[in-house]
Every structure is written in C-alpha cells, then in structure tokens.
C-alpha cells in the first residue's frame, strides 16, 4: 500500500484530502494517516493531499465541512467525509468499501464505460485557489476604493484652508486697487497668495503622483496599525548609536493615538530612515525628538526633529528629489536616495512629507498618514 502527494490523477485510485487548521498540526496528522494506510490491504493506491483549511475555504464549503480535522474521500465518487479525532479508526472501517468503489471505476475505465468523467480533485483544488484569490482581490479593490474616497474627502478638507487664504488675499488686493494699500502690503499679499497657491499645487501633485501607481510599484499592503508598536523596535535598534554619540532622545507618542491605515514595513522604513539621518547629522551631545500627534480626524502627523547643522533654504525644495545630495553631504553615505524613497512611500499612502529647517539650528521632517476608519463610519 502506498500514499502519494503527486499531482497525477489516477481515477482508479483513492484520492484523499486531509483538512485541518494550522500547518504543523496537519502535517503531523497526515504522517500518522500515511503510516496507517500503508498497513491496510488493497490493490488500489491512496493519494493523500494535505489541505490547510484557511487556504481553501471554498473547498471546505464544497464538501460541507463542519468539524475539523476532516478526511475527505474525494475520489472515487460519491465523496465521503470522515470527521473527528479518531480518523484512523473510521478510515479502517470504510476502507474495504472504498477499495470496492475504486475497483468498479477501474473496471469501467477498462471497459470504456466512463466517457465523461467528473472534475478531478486537482481541478477542484485549483478552482478553490482561484476563487479564494479572486475573493481576496475583490476585498482589496473594495478597500482601495473606500480608501480613495476618504483621500478625496481629505484633499477637499485640506484645500479649503489655502483656498480661503488665497481668496481673502485677492479680495483685499481688489478692494485696494484705488490706492488704499501701500506697496509693501501689496507685495506681502501677493507673496502670501503665491505661497498658498504653491501649497495647493503641492497637495494636488502628491495625489496625482500616488494615483500614477506608486502604491502598486511599491506593493503597499495597508492594514490597521498602531504607530506606537511600530516605532518601538526602530527606537530600540537605533538606541546604541544614540547612546554612543551621547545624544538626548525623546519620543512623544500619545497613548490615545488612533490607528493608521498603512503598510507597517514601509512606514517603519520611513521612520528608521529619518531617525538614522538625524543621528548621523546631529553632533555629539545634541538632541533628537520623535513626535506623533493626531493632527485632524483624518490624519496623524509624525515629526523627527534634530539639532544638526540644518539645511540651506535654497536646497529644501529639492531635498526629496531622486539622488539629490546636499553640499554638506559629500562625505556622508546615502542620504538623497533615502529621502526620495521616503517621499515615494508617504505619497503611496496619500500622505505628505516636508521639511522645516533653520541653518545652524536643526531640522524637522514631518509626514502625514491616514487615520484608520471602518467603512461607513
């Protein structure tokens, strides 16, 4: 007597499927059943296949499984389900009948009496995998559509403030066309309007960039995530370097911070990169701060601040561009590529990233992430 896990379909044999939860448990049970089957009499081989229940829910529905572990005799038809703890004893009881069914199928094949065979077990397994994959893709697409709806709502909310400020500046300029405003005030209003327009342009650009597929290129897998739990391993990993430079480090992460909708690995990479740069550029005895705040009902803001040399104002606009290196960085490793990747990751999460810096005093890198909300809430 032999058992097999190969994919060749022999309809005169006995095709068995073992369903259980947890790979470790199911493999141990499968090995016990293999040894038991080898001791049973019969001319028709048994092909035993392990089927993790969580990976084949459709197949479990097909065989109407209620209790696991379960052993399904899938072929010869009709299918039969054995369930419970003592599968070996039940198998021994039904084994003679299954051998008889296999013998009948073998006779029919030899006599040419079976012109239209039903789908094989392997075909059912493949269909189960495809259905499960389609269900996962449909759920992911639905989640992406819901998420993009929330992003549009966030964009409208964020655009309202600079749009209002621009409108007020233009209205004031229009009212002062008859000379009631002096030139200095006019220049200030024009500059304010230009700044707000640039801010709106940046917001729209971020959304358009993410819509071009940066999320799919980076393979973002967004889930509900606790930022505090995500940050802790990063801090622990970098702590020896912080202590080696005698830097003062402070993390301010509120306990009531809402969960965010992010890819944990990607956002961990962003936080690590920003903290790594802060350690690299902050002189010994300086300070670094990680701060997270609930900015609005829809956003969380993460800030990494340092007391390093700062970034020249003229170079702040391009600091997140691909492979941009500041004049101060020629002796340092990396930097430009890391910040470029940070921007791509944050944009793929429909967030924004920017820097505020004063030369000679330090820098603060900020980025926003979407708050996790259940659909319909």
UniProtKB/Swiss-Prot annotation:
Phosphoprotein listed as a keyword: yes
Pfam families assigned to the protein according to its UniProt record, in alphabetical order: HATPase_c, HisKA, KaiB
Known role: Member of the two-component regulatory system SasA/RpaA involved in genome-wide circadian gene expression. One of several clock output pathways. Participates in the Kai clock protein complex, the main circadian regulator in cyanobacteria, via its interaction with KaiC. KaiC enhances the autophosphorylation activity of SasA, which then transfers its phosphate group to RpaA to activate it. In addition to its output function, recruits fold-shifted KaiB (KaiB(fs)) to KaiC to cooperatively form the KaiB(6):KaiC(6) complex (independent of SasA kinase activity).
Record organism: Synechococcus sp. (strain JA-3-3Ab) (Cyanobacteria bacterium Yellowstone A-Prime)
Annotated domain remarks: The N-terminus interacts with KaiC, while the C-terminal histidine kinase domain autophosphorylates and is probably responsible for self-oligomerization. The N-terminal domain stimulates the C-terminus to autophosphorylate.
Gene Ontology biological-process entries: circadian rhythm
Gene3D superfamilies: 1.10.287.130, Glutaredoxin, Histidine kinase-like ATPase, C-terminal domain
Protein name listed in UniProt: Adaptive-response sensory kinase SasA
